Amino acid sequence: MLLTHTSSRWRTAAVCALAATASWLPSVQAAEKTQADYFVSSLPGAPEGPLLKMHAGHIEVDAEHNSNLFFWHYENRHIADRQRTVLWLNGGPGCSSMDGAMMEIGPYRVKHGGHLEYNNGSWDEFANMLFIDQPVGTGFSYVNTDSYLTDLDQMAEHMMIFLEKWFKLFPEYENDDLYIAGESYAGQHIPYIARAILNRNKNQNTDPKPWNLKGLLIGNGWISPADQYLAYLPFAYQNGMIQADSDSAKRVEQQQSICIQKLQDGGHDKVDTSECEQIMVAILEETKDRKADRMNQCLNMYDIRLRDDSSCGMNWPPDLTDVTPYLRRPDVIKALHINSDKKTGWSECNGAVSGHFRAKNSVPTVKFLPELLTEVPILLFSGDKDFICNHVGTEAMIENMSWNGGKGWEVSPGVWAPKQDWTFEGEPAGTYQEVRNLTYVVFYNSSHMVPFDYPKRTRDMLDRFMNVDISAIGGDPADSRIDGEKGPLTSVGDHPNSTKAEEDKAQQLKEAEWKAYYRSGEVVLVILIIVACLWGAFLWRTRRSTSLYKGVDGDEGRESLLTGMGLDNFRRGARRHDVEAADFDERELDDLDDAPKKPANGYSNVNSEKERQPHNDSTFSLGADSDDEAEGSERGRRKEHS
């Protein structure tokens, strides 16, 4: 009895345990997010028509410190020969990639009043776009306030965790050709991430499949700090900001001498050297016009054609006055699935992130850029009116760097890669240079954020770099020429109704039309055979009936039989059935073929927006900076390399 009672107890306990487990499992499963949890079903202010396919939200990269990275993904509008994904990062460190999404290369631009317009030049034409706010704490990303990152290897590790989880959520993109692009301080982020991906690909003992990293694009990049620091004064001379041998020049040269000494004392191996950063600060001080009104006293460090208040460009670009309130709207926050753990509103740049991210244990990416060039093509591009990460510094870095068996622009001993003129739609656009897996593009009359000024030109650059050829798709390619020669036919958007999908639809319609004709003929033939058989049977029965009843009812018997068998009704029914069997008649096919076709991507007015023109000075007279978290010198640093 005791054993039986004990056994019964254990059975009861086991049943209870199983029941508890069963009730617990669904809650665990519910915690696992799926694609559907990230799907953006509506976006406030979006243009009329079908919404672009997009996903957005947070992915946890470190549970211990509540570290979550925010992403916003747009599916490509068209596919050329294969699938491609471009991962975009802005700089800072600590500046949101929503700058890229909403002011540069994303499909929408925010207008006054919070409505969105299509960006004629967005990069989602032939590539899926993945914008990520990183490091943690940047933009919509968040982390415990005592857990901000400090070094570039930490950032790369977080990005690898993010990508592993993201590709698990969206496996259909894992085999895409992958490109990583960005600007400014992303010149540090991108090579570190690329190196981590390449190392992962080589370690196939633990990782399931390699990621197809195909190229890197870096605009006005902070790659070689030493070359950039020593380029500030030459750039100022070239652009007439400071006159050589003037008192101003002598004061700046004195600060440059201090910088050179610091570089010789180990600064070449550092990402930031504060004594060298003071060179740019000194030039901005020397070029201030203290007699001008308050909003025009200082040069804009991001676009020297413009002037600003004493923040010297921190209020730029002007679209911030519309982007910031839009991204802080409750309905937008809800649409983008922003977690409730994100306690503060969106800000362009986070001073706390920048203040912690000093990269003291990191080497500048120029140190291993040559190694990357042996495995991955790299494109560097520069707006020629940017001061903070100017083209003079980038060109000095290239000339001083050795990779793939040569130094700088040397193709062979004594032979250098030519600088080729680039024209776009009949206007001088810049120059191209290519050598040993490196491409360098200079954009004329452009700022620190080149896509902000010339989205269509930058997408032409992207499509060339990705070797996109739209000859199999249709559409009207851009008139883009390097040294007078047209390259591959690449799209710049003005063909939403001329894609391969539309052509396939037209071909399918023609095939359906012929099938309908053929099917109609078959149906008619079958019906005629049936009618003939019935008619034969009818005649046989009629003759038989007539012979039996003739002389009794005269001809009335035949008439009554015709009516009684309902042959007239059968003919009418057969005619209706014929039309239904073929689904539609020729007139309906003609109407279908002549009906106007709507683009599958929902772009109704994508081509109406003209390319942005250079802004005048008054355009940039804005209010306070978007970041409320930093002041003084820290405020200057946090967006120093945005």
From Swiss-Prot:
It is a single-pass type I membrane protein. Residues 541-642 are cytoplasmic. The chain crosses the membrane at residues 520-540. Glycans are attached at residues 120, 400, 437, 445, 497. Keywords: Apoptosis, Carboxypeptidase, Glycoprotein, Golgi apparatus, Hydrolase, Membrane, Protease, Signal, Transmembrane, Transmembrane helix. The keyword Cell inner membrane does not apply. The active site is at residues 184, 386, 448. Residues 476-500, 586-642 are annotated as: Disordered. It catalyses: Preferential release of a C-terminal arginine or lysine residue. Residues 632-642 have a biased composition (Basic and acidic residues). It is found in: Golgi apparatus, trans-Golgi network membrane. One of its GO terms (biological process) is apoptotic process. Its main location: Golgi. GO terms for cellular component: membrane; trans-Golgi network. Residues 31-519 are lumenal. Residues 1-30 form the signal peptide. GO terms for molecular function: serine-type carboxypeptidase activity. Its EC number is 3.4.16.6. Protease with a carboxypeptidase B-like function involved in the C-terminal processing of the lysine and arginine residues from protein precursors. Promotes cell fusion and is involved in the programmed cell death. Belongs to the peptidase S10 family. This is Pheromone-processing carboxypeptidase KEX1. It comes from Phaeosphaeria nodorum (strain SN15 / ATCC MYA-4574 / FGSC 10173). The gene is KEX1.
